[in-house]
Amino acid sequence: MQFTTTTLIAILSALAVASPIEPRQNATAQQERLCTSAIDTAMCCQTTLAGVINQTCTTPAITPINKQAFRAYCAAQGQDSSCCKTPLVGDGVICTPP
């Protein structure tokens, strides 16, 4: 009996952990993912070499709620909106458009 109860609790716990939970939709604005990759960082960049390597990048001082707001914020700073990965070696940052 104890083995059955323990096994049942273990199975139900595993199911609860494995089931995805969808975020609730409500009237407030939800933040859109600015970059497609989870390892990218949304940054405003100034100098671009071949459209890929950026030297002067900063993170936005605000948190834009969508890509249009992100582009507008960076444009107001005189920079381009980019999704960047910091390389392990070197000074440059590898970036792509959002």
From Swiss-Prot:
CDD domains in the record: hydrophobin_II
Keywords: Cell wall, Disulfide bond, Glycoprotein, Secreted, Signal
InterPro entries from the UniProt entry: Cerato-ulmin_hydrophobin (IPR010636), Hydrophobin_sf (IPR036686)
Extent of the signal sequence: 1-18
Entry keyword Disulfide bond: yes
Record-annotated disulphide pairs: C35-C83, C44-C74, C45-C57, C84-C95
One Pfam family, short name: Hydrophobin_2
Disruption phenotype: Does not seem to affect germination and growth, formation of sclerotia, ability to penetrate and infect host tissue, nor spore and mycelium surface properties.
Gene3D superfamilies: Hydrophobin (3.20.120.10)
Residues modified by glycosylation: N26, N54
Location relative to the cell: Secreted; Secreted, Cell wall
Keyword Coiled coil: no
This protein's GO CC annotations: extracellular region
Domain of life: Eukaryota
Function: Aerial growth, conidiation, and dispersal of filamentous fungi in the environment rely upon a capability of their secreting small amphipathic proteins called hydrophobins (HPBs) with low sequence identity. Class I can self-assemble into an outermost layer of rodlet bundles on aerial cell surfaces, conferring cellular hydrophobicity that supports fungal growth, development and dispersal; whereas Class II form highly ordered films at water-air interfaces through intermolecular interactions but contribute nothing to the rodlet structure.
UniProt record similarity statement: Belongs to the cerato-ulmin hydrophobin family.
Protein name: Class II hydrophobin 3
Species, as recorded: Botryotinia fuckeliana (strain B05.10)
Organism placement in taxonomy: Eukaryota, Fungi, Dikarya, Ascomycota, Pezizomycotina
Gene label: Bhp3
